[in-house]
Amino acid sequence: MRAAHIVRPVYMFMTVFSVSLLLLAGTNSTFAAEIEPFVGDYVGSANVVDSDGTETPRDMSVSISELKDGFNVSWTTTTYKGDGRIKEEEYSVDFKTTERPDVFSAAMKRNVFGHEVPLDPMKGEPFVWGRIEGATLTVFSLFIGPNGGYELQQFDRTLADGGLDLSFSRFRNGEKSRSVETFLEKK
């Protein structure tokens, strides 16, 4: 009689544990199906348009890769200044799944416990997050200035035949200050 009382709780625990693993596996495979079409290396160039209408030529590349529990977006921009100077900037952000479907948090630094966490916009660092909506992977970056004003950058990367359509916008306190649209070819 005692063995039956022990076996039943163990059986129930194993059943709940197995169902939980199946649900987690389903969640991960759903995620993989969402990011997989975006995975790859892309290159292109465009003229960035400032709010005053001036244009600056820029080369761009982006690499999107799948991670164990999220994905990485790494991008490089090379700006050609009118005086002959060349400015290159590189960025790389890991994105982790969240409890919200299709919304991803940025893991840009580690806290004292070794966990990856977003940066703190109240310290002048960008708050970054991403989302997948249909055929578009969007990365947002929010900056809060010393006076409380803000800057929001939005990178929309939409799947297109042979690559990605890139649409970038920068808003300062609600006013669009810079934008670019171009095609990035898959390598």
Give the positions of each predicted feature:
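Calycin-type beta-barrel ligand-binding domains and close structural analogs
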Residues: S45-D52, T56-P57, D69, T79-K187
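Generic extreme N-terminus detector
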Residues: H5, V16-S18, E36
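N-terminal helix-cap/turn-to-beta initiation motif at the start of protein domains
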Residues: T30-V43, E66, R131
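N-terminal secretory signal peptides that target proteins for export/translocation
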Residues: M1-V10
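Bacterial N-terminal signal peptides
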Residues: F13-G26
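Basic/polar N-terminal segments that are highly enriched at the extreme N-terminus
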Residues: M1-R2, G26-A33
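Single-residue "anchor" positions within short linear motifs
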Residues: V73-W75
